[in-house]
Structures are given as structure tokens and as C-alpha cells.
């Protein structure tokens, strides 16, 4: 590919990613099918909707886009939702294993040539899943697809104990009305003995663009809380930069990580340095790095 063609393709890719941004109503639909065990009983299909979600570029460099999602609930409450970072020709991945443990993986320049990594983060900016793929622009279609392992989704992690890994094939497709996140998932029970697939699942999340006025409350909320979450991201980035495996302790004193970090929004000191120190203290308590006896952190 010539330099000009490569530059044009890169700009096409970035434009498609930015097309995910805006104010959206969303429908979420999931259904299980093809159980691998005849004794498995299919669970009821899942349906949910969100009246408004504000999605926007929070940071941008030549090869990176940080996109934050904010959920508007009942026109009165804002929920800091998930975040997705897009990195061009990224060579550093955190691959989910199981039991809140992610393995650091280095990729060669040959493997990632022309590819984008989508890094998906939880509401507290902790890792969720990461995958590589190539944006495709053909016949008026614009889409990206990747397969990667992930923790249980939020809709099931407190409801299910019969599987512990979801192998997700994610497909993001830009449409005239917004975008669609299609999923072909495998629900897997993973152990030292290997993987056992319980059932397949189809997911379809449809993002339909609505007027930005429906998301004004989210815009205002972010202006108030942006600086705090920039500090949180910076501390996570410092951990990721060490390029070591990561394990997150599920609970400390009956409090999960997101509760501890969200509490600091209002309770931390009023200077950036005090806030940063408080964030560092929380992360040091919950996050274990390296592979030395990491399973003890999740018992």
C-alpha cells in the first residue's frame, strides 16, 4: 500500500470510529442457541433498552482515540458507563484468562500491520477485554470485527456461576442511523483441564442517533467530573505501561473496585495531588501485578 493510500485508509478508519459518537437510544438483545450438552437448558432471551447515551471522543492523537460512554437514566441520573480506546497498530494487549486475571501479550509489527485494537474498559476504567482487527470499507459498508476472551457481561456476572469466560466475536458496523454492535459469543467454563463450551449466544445492540439535547445532562455531568477520571485513567495507564499480568481482587471489606473509585469522586482531597494519591492507594490494594501466585488474590 502506498503512503497516500495508507494515509487515506487511516483517515477512513478514524472517521468510522468517530461515527460511533453522538447521542443515542440503544436496544440490547441476546439469545442462546445450540447448547453443546443435551442436558443444558437454554436461558430466556434478554432484552433491555437505554433511552439516551452520550458517546464522545475524550482524547485523540494520531494513532489513538479514547471514547467515553455516559448513560442517562430517567432524564435525571448519569451513570459513567463503559469506555473504548482505539489504538492503531498497537503491539500491547491484555488478554483475559479467567478469575479476573489478564495476561500481558506482546504482538509483532507484522501481526498488527493496518489493524486497530479496541480496548474495552469497565465503568471504573479497569480492563474488560481487548481485541485486534482491521476496519473494512467496501460497497458502502464500514465495519470492524475481532474475536477475544472476556469476563462475563454485566447482565450475567451476578446471575451465573456455570461459566467463567465469554469468547466474543464483536462486529461493529456503521449504519445510516447510527451503528450496530453484533456479537457471536461462546459461553465457556475454563479450568486447568481446558475449555468446555456450554452454549452459543447471539447478541445485537442497536445504537440509533437522537437529538443531542437528550444528552445535555451527561455533557454537564462530564464537565464536573472529567478531571477526576482523567487522573484515574492516568494511573491505570501507568500500571498497563509496566507490561505485567494483572489480577483484580474482587472485594475488599465488602466493597468492589468500582465502588471504591466512585466514592473518591466526592470524598477525595481537593487538590489533584491528594486525589492522585488516593487513587493510587485504592489501585494498590485491589490490583496485583505479575504472575506470582496470582490465584491467591481471587480466592
Task: Locate each region found by the language model.
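Hydrophobic/aromatic beta-strand elements that line small-molecule binding cavities or substrate pockets
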Residues: 42-44, 48-58, 68-70, 83-85, ...
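Tryptophan-anchored aromatic micro-motifs
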Residues: 19-32
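Amphipathic/hydrophobic helical signal segments and adjacent flexible N-terminal regions
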Residues: 4-16, 31-45, 60-73, 93, ...
Amino acid at each position: 500500500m502506498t503512503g497516500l493510500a495508507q494515509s487515506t485508509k487511516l483517515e477512513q478508519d478514524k472517521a468510522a470510529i468517530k461515527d460511533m459518537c453522538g447521542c443515542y437510544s440503544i436496544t440490547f438483545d441476546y439469545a442462546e442457541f445450540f447448547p453443546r450438552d443435551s442436558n443444558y437448558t437454554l436461558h430466556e432471551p434478554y432484552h433491555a433498552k437505554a433511552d439516551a447515551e452520550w458517546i464522545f471522543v475524550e482524547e485523540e492523537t494520531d494513532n489513538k482515540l479514547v471514547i467515553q460512554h455516559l448513560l442517562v437514566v430517567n432524564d435525571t441520573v448519569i451513570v459513567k458507563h463503559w469506555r473504548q480506546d482505539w489504538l492503531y497498530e498497537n503491539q500491547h494487549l491484555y488478554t483475559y484468562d479467567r478469575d479476573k486475571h489478564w495476561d500481558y501479550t506482546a504482538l509483532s509489527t507484522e501481526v498488527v500491520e493496518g489493524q486497530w485494537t479496541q480496548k474495552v474498559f469497565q465503568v471504573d476504567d479497569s480492563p474488560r477485554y481487548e481485541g485486534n482487527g482491521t476496519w473494512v470499507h467496501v460497497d458502502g459498508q464500514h465495519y470492524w470485527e475481532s474475536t477475544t476472551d472476556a469476563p462475563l457481561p454485566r447482565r450475567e456476572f451476578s446471575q451465573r456461576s456455570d461459566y467463567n469466560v465469554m469468547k466474543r466475536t464483536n462486529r461493529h458496523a456503521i449504519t445510516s442511523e447510527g451503528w450496530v454492535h453484533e456479537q457471536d459469543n461462546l459461553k465457556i467454563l475454563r479450568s486447568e483441564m481446558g475449555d468446555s463450551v456450554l452454549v452459543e449466544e447471539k447478541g445485537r445492540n442497536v445504537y440509533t442517533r437522537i437529538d443531542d439535547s437528550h444528552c445535555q445532562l451527561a455533557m454537564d455531568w462530564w464537565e464536573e467530573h472529567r478531571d477526576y477520571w482523567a487522573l484515574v485513567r492516568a494511573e491505570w495507564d501507568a500500571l498497563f505501561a509496566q507490561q505485567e499480568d494483572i489480577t483484580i481482587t474482587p472485594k475488599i471489606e465488602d466493597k468492589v473496585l468500582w465502588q471504591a473509585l466512585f466514592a473518591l469522586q466526592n470524598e477525595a482531597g481537593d487538590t489533584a495531588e491528594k486525589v492522585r494519591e488516593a487513587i493510587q492507594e485504592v489501585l494498590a490494594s485491589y490490583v496485583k501485578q505479575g504472575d506470582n501466585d496470582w490465584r491467591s488474590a481471587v480466592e
